[in-house]
Amino acid sequence: MIKAIDKESINNICSGQVIFDLSIAVKELIENSIDAGATTVEIRLKEYGEEFIEVIDNGSGVEPSNFVALTMKHCTSKLESFSDLLSIETYGFRGEALSSLCSLSNCIITTRTKNQVTAQRLVFDKEGKIQTQTPVAREVGTTVQLSNLFKGLPVRYQEFKRNIKKEYAKLLTILQAYALISTNTRITCYNQAGKSPRSCVLSTTSGSTIRDNLINVFGTKMSQSLDEFTASDSLFKVNGLISKIGIGSGTGQSISNSSSSSSQSSSQLSSSSSSSSSSQSSQLSIGSLSRSCADRQFFFVNSRPFEHSKLAKEINSLYQSFHKRGSYPVVIFNIEMPTNNYDVNVTPDKRTIFIQKEQQLLLLITDGLKTMWETAQSVFDTNQLGQFTFNDENENDNSNNNKQSKISSFPNLYTLKTEEDENNNKITTPIKKHSTTTTTSSLNSPSSNKKSSNSTSSSSSSNNKNNRNNLEEDGDDSFDITDQQPLKRAKYDGNYNNSNKKPELPKTPYPNKKKNNENEDEDEDEDNYVQPVFSNVNKSKNSSNSGSSNSLDDIIDDNEFISRSNGNSSNFMDDFEFKGSSNNIGSSSNGIKLKTISNNNNSNNSNNSNKIIDDINKTIDKMKQQQQPQQKMGLNDDGDDEEQQKQKQQQQQQKRKQQQQQQQIEEEEEETIDGYKQKNSKTFDITIKTDLNTISKQYLIRNGTFDKDNNPIIPNTALVVSNDDMVVNNNNSNEFDQNSIITTTSEKCCIVDKSIPQLDGKFSTSLGGIGAKQQQKAATQVTSQLQQQPSQTNQKTAEEELTKFFKKEYFKQMIVIGQFNLGFIIAKLGNDLFIIDQHAADEKYNFEILSKSVESSINSQPLLKPDTLSDLTSEEELIIIENVDLFKKNGFKFIIDHDAPTRFKIKLSAFPIIHGQSFGIKDIYEWIFMIKESSIPGSVNKIPRLNSLLASKACRKSIMVGTTLTHKEMKDVLNNLSTLDNPWCCPHGRPTMRHLVDLSIKDKLKQQQQQQQQKQQQQQQQ
């Protein structure tokens, strides 16, 4: 017999369907608060919601006339008829939530409107009827208190208590969704566990945008890792945030269409500006923030949270095609559409929504994301040269020797060192085998073994200034190398000459300055040895007296390096001065002694060396004539008060004393490199690079106008200057100009140290009179000012400073500099320096070539006996029948019998063989699954395993790491990238290129320095 169910049972049955867990109970209360216009919503939980739930808001409140109907079933003020659902704009509309909460818990509501003097506290029974009503004090708004949730349902209550932590975690996820989308609304959640004080688990500050709320909910780091996304058509408008892909610049940040940069010169990188997905966080270089699960993906329809598995699946699949498999993006998308285009009345929790023209929405989002991410791959964060630092020399030398990298494509690839290099920077200069450019000590002169206590080793720079300026005018950077610390050497005793004698390096003391007295210097103990540059110097014992390149080949090994690091003072290329202390620079000298190591006849080398010696001696004579009593730059000159200057000098002497004590401690720590015991020797050596003709040819190579294969560069002479052989006679002055020691020879270009720790001991100041630490501080201030410039401008300017938009066509215009570590190509475009992965670049080229040739390389292999696919279900058979042309295009051929029973309709008659690899039944099953899971018809148009096969084949036939490339081969790699559809990453996800440094910062630093000099001069004049 059919009978009507009693009201209490109906209440419990229906209420249990509407409120089925903790998160839905709190969600309904939050939606009521937001619908009431609340700008502050506070959620309070006790024992994670098991004992007590309270939601407090400052909304409009409930009018007294609505108290009775407030908790009645299907009573609402938000719609009157079913047709109103097509225009509903509020979260709630069915009038079921409060009635169900009253049935499942103890419910108390306290509310007040702006027209009431006091609030009313309403206690409801299980049927939603008011039991008691009392006036209480409260501001305008509503408070809903729930206790003992689900206690009337024994099974559900026990399940609720047992899984309370899971319920609580699910609640927080839903709270995060509302906190993100509710702009200009402050949402706060507190929880009190046991007797401990309550803790805030979520809080927003009524942000005006989703990104503001995101920072409050998930932190700044996540905000910096998300790009803004916008896509729209005539029906839909999508706004939100999504993870960067992390390709190209390491951040994958998106920019506008390339048309924004079309007006700029094609030879320079275009600066990114505003876009459909402009990244406000692009000032900070934070990489892609992918997750191992899709736990932070939030979708909204007109600001209503909902779940859409198809949309999430398409986004995740597309993201993994750009990033890597198993990674999921953070997604926050709000889809705006007309209210009559979707149906929210599908499930009790309203989190499932049916959307008209769903395929159009999916295509809009996927196409927009694909375009954005493809563009983002060509955006590179620019690394300012002032931020480019090297490893400190105090690191473990053994590990450094094992990990040193070398630039090897050309015999001489110069280490770039510019004015803005800061203190403690390290330069690694490679020594190539079969290259005669090397560094050693020339100490064979008896007079050079010991010097007076006042003499100090100094350095000279003999770069041809006119030629350097010409290079700079052509858009290239100067080749100046600034060596900062003495070279590390292994202990070895002997003297190296082009004779029958075995190469030896004699013991050489150097002046160890003691600071007890400013003018007191004493020679260091004889056990401080000059150590040879090359670690395996024992090989040189077999060198012949012919001076041929074989002797150098025996001495120099491929993997040997000379490391230098800055001393106590930073340096700039131009307008650089040393100001001496009360100690004069040297007492007597015969000039500078040079030594040559040649691979040609000795007569030619001696003539070249004599010319350089004459030029250097002439330069020293000019230097003596240009002595000036005043500091030219005066960066630390606060006035003419001599007492202040003396005090500053005393402070500087104390600082140098501490520094030298630290150096003496470091000297006692012996190290072992390549089997030789080493000390941190304070001797100073000067590396002199090759001749000007070689540099000119090198410049032509770097600019793509010189063929290395047809005209290889072999340096004629390697010149060496010893610290003890080079003494400047400057008795009558305590200052000299660095520019005056640059030689004007047209035969050779000498590049030497500009800053020496020993000179810091002799000279009280450098760089126009500032001390080492002051100088470092000044350089740091210059760099920091340049780094802070973007923050002083608007957002658009900041993004333009920190991002570069790289077009594919630029690859053809790049100038090959050389090969680094036998694995990377260094190339230059304008003022920007890039590093290209030779293997990834060639692999991507081969992959796209193979992909384009797939259709022509598919061979269908017929079967003698067609194979019945009896494991197929009726659904899978239908998928094959509907996509039979797609299967046939990829080499699969079927015999279909529509009259046969299920599981016997389809027989495989031929399978494809592509590039020697056959595909079979397993590939058919996998392909069927991919087609079934795809939300967009025709999106899976290739055999799933085909891409991995082509990627593996392309990898094996590509240029491998460790392969030496010629200039033409490197240029071909770059030219090939310009022809690709997507040249930014290889099929396995490795980026093909990174931005190394923007060299234009050098000019900014120089300009900043000049401005400071002008200010100091103005202060002195005043």
Curated annotation (Swiss-Prot):
Q: What is this protein called?
A: Mismatch repair endonuclease pms1
The record's listing under Gene3D superfamilies reads: 3.30.230.10, Histidine kinase-like ATPase, C-terminal domain, MutL, C-terminal domain, dimerisation subdomain, MutL, C-terminal domain, regulatory subdomain
Keyword Cell cycle on entry: yes
Q: Where is this region: Disordered?
A: 251-282, 390-527, 622-676
Q: Does the keyword DNA repair apply?
A: yes
Which GO MF term does the entry hold, naming one? ATP-dependent DNA damage sensor activity
Q: Report the locations given in the UniProt record.
A: Nucleus
- Main localisation: nucleus
| Keywords (A to Z) from UniProt | Cell cycle, DNA damage, DNA repair, Nucleus
GO annotations under biological process?
Answer: mismatch repair
| A GO cellular component entry from the record | MutLalpha complex
Q: Which domain of life is it from?
A: Eukaryota
Q: State what this protein does.
A: Component of the post-replicative DNA mismatch repair system (MMR). Heterodimerizes with mlh1 to form MutL alpha. DNA repair is initiated by MutS alpha (msh2-msh6) or MutS beta (msh2-msh3) binding to a dsDNA mismatch, then MutL alpha is recruited to the heteroduplex. Assembly of the MutL-MutS-heteroduplex ternary complex in presence of rfc and pcna is sufficient to activate endonuclease activity of pms1. It introduces single-strand breaks near the mismatch and thus generates new entry points for the exonuclease exo1 to degrade the strand containing the mismatch.
Sorted alphabetically, which PANTHER family does this protein's record hold? DNA MISMATCH REPAIR PROTEIN MLH, PMS, MUTL (PTHR10073), MISMATCH REPAIR ENDONUCLEASE PMS2 (PTHR10073:SF52)
Q: For bias kind Low complexity, which ranges apply? A: 436-469, 647-664
Lineage at the top is:
Eukaryota, Amoebozoa, Evosea, Eumycetozoa, Dictyostelia
- List where Polar residues composition bias occurs: 403-412
Q: Which family does it belong to?
A: Belongs to the DNA mismatch repair MutL/HexB family.
Could you describe the subunit structure of this protein? Heterodimer of pms1 and mlh1 (MutL alpha). Forms a ternary complex with MutS alpha (msh2-msh6) or MutS beta (msh2-msh3).
